[in-house]
């Protein structure tokens, strides 16, 4: 399938969402803390609403999975996966590392991914089998083959944080540069563009990673569970890399 209409709707949804993001960014707004200690802002809710409305107008019978509302199951082969604002903590503190993530899954495959970070002027898009692009330029993962001085970004959630920090000790004593920027979409873009060599996630949700996964894979990267098995979006722990370092990093994580 070519997914031409789906691609057009995805891009329009991104444009609509970006306008709301920009309207709220840097402004004081209502903030709530969810049960899992993450934040939700008024901007999250409005961005979520406009993306859903844009998609539903074109595809009323498609499934929609989003962070900020219940799963809309229409028993369709098509599922839209939405994170209206990834990096909400950054967003509400006016840190520009935050943005919008929308993906389309057809049956078992993520076929389209769109990440927009308006405060950083980043517009990323990928289609399965057709490459990954940032601001219209094709991107690719790094060519690094050795662990020495490689850059690994990581993601920790609030739940069982101590346990997850223990997992990072696998990298202690190694010449690896560990970084965390507070937004999964940015971490995935860093790997997809070759600015980081790998990304380790110890707890996540499908909407955090779906769009970024197709970007990484189309840029030549590799994704697996942190035990090396083939991944599913229902998993919560992942290793994402340039592919060349994947085996070496898995060996560290399996210790």
Predicted features along the sequence, with ranges:
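N-terminal subdomain of lithium-sensitive/metallo-dependent phosphomonoesterases centered on the IMPase/IPPase/PAP
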Residues: 1-85, 244
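Solvent-exposed alpha-helices and their adjacent loops that cap or buttress functional pockets
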Residues: 32, 72-74, 107, 125, ...
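An extended, acidic
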Residues: 140-255
């Amino acid at each position: 399938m070519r997914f031409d209409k789906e691609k057009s709707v995805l891009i329009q949804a991104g444009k609509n969402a970006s306008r709301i993001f920009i309207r709220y960014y840097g402004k004081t707004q209502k903030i709530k803390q969810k049960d899992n200690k993450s934040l939700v802002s008024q901007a999250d809710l409005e961005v979520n609403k406009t993306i859903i409305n844009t998609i539903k107008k074109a595809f009323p019978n498609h499934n929609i999975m989003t962070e900020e509302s219940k799963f809309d199951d229409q028993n369709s082969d098509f599922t839209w996966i939405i994170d209206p604002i990834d990096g909400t903590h950054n967003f509400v503190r006016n840190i520009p590392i935050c943005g919008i993530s929308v993906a389309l899954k057809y049956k078992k495959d993520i076929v389209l991914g769109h990440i927009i970070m308006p405060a950083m002027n980043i517009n990323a898009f990928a289609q399965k089998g057709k490459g990954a692009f940032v601001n219209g330029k094709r991107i690719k993962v790094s060519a690094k083959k050795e662990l020495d001085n490689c850059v690994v970004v990581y993601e920790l959630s609030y739940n069982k944080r101590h346990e997850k920090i223990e997992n990072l000790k696998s990298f202690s004593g190694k010449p690896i540069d560990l970084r965390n920027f507070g937004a999964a979409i940015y971490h995935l873009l860093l790997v997809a563009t070759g600015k980081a060599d790998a990304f380790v996630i110890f707890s996540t949700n499908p909407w955090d990673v779906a769009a970024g996964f197709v970007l990484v894979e189309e840029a030549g990267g590799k994704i697996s569970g942190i035990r090396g098995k083939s991944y599913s979006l229902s998993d919560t722990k992942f290793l994402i890399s340039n592919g060349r370092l994947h085996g070496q990093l898995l060996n560290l994580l399996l210790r």
